[in-house]
Amino acid sequence: MQQYSILVLHGPNLNLLGKREPNIYGSVTLDEINLLLSEEAKNLDVTVTCVQSNHEGILIDTIHQAWGLHQGIIINAGAYTHTSVAIRDALSAVKIPTVEVHLSNIYQRETFRHHSYIAPVAIGQISGFGVGSYRLGLLAIVEYLRKLENNH
């Protein structure tokens, strides 16, 4: 069985987790999320590389660089979820299976958050489970990749 490498992308303002609107996003920091993902990755015998940026171009460049390096992507694009055709196009271009995750349930929030440019190019979307959304996203992408491998 192949050992997969998963890129985890955190978008704008996620560096403020634990401080920013804890009533919506919880009190867990981004470093704690990354640690949780690293521990879960070990249990699944995969590796994760976590990148956070507040800049759309850096996120796009990181997606481009993932081509041939990572077999899966987990992305929480933050507010770019609802605005960035460029991130959507980058994900579509590299054709790496992607799971979109959100800490909060974006469909229970403001109407402008109900639309995702990423969802149509992702294999799935997980939202509303707090930190668990990331863990579920990792489990989902690994299961997807293993099924894909077994079918070939």
UniProtKB/Swiss-Prot annotation:
Pfam families: DHquinase_II (PF01220). CDD domains: DHQase_II. It is an enzyme of class 4 (lyase). One of its GO terms (molecular function) is 3-dehydroquinate dehydratase activity. The record marks R20 as: Transition state stabilizer. Gene3D superfamilies: Dehydroquinase, class II (3.40.50.9100). Pathway: Metabolic intermediate biosynthesis; chorismate biosynthesis; chorismate from D-erythrose 4-phosphate and phosphoenolpyruvate: step 3/7. InterPro entries: DHquinase_II, DHquinase_II_CS, DHquinase_II_sf. PROSITE patterns: DEHYDROQUINASE_II. It comes from the Bacteria. Its EC number is 4.2.1.10. It catalyses: 3-dehydroquinate = 3-dehydroshikimate + H2O. The active site is at Y25 (proton acceptor), H102 (proton donor). GO terms for biological process: amino acid biosynthetic process; aromatic amino acid family biosynthetic process; chorismate biosynthetic process; quinate catabolic process. Catalyzes a trans-dehydration via an enolate intermediate. Belongs to the type-II 3-dehydroquinase family. This is 3-dehydroquinate dehydratase. The lineage of its organism: Bacteria, Bacillati, Cyanobacteriota, Cyanophyceae, Oscillatoriophycideae. The gene is aroQ.
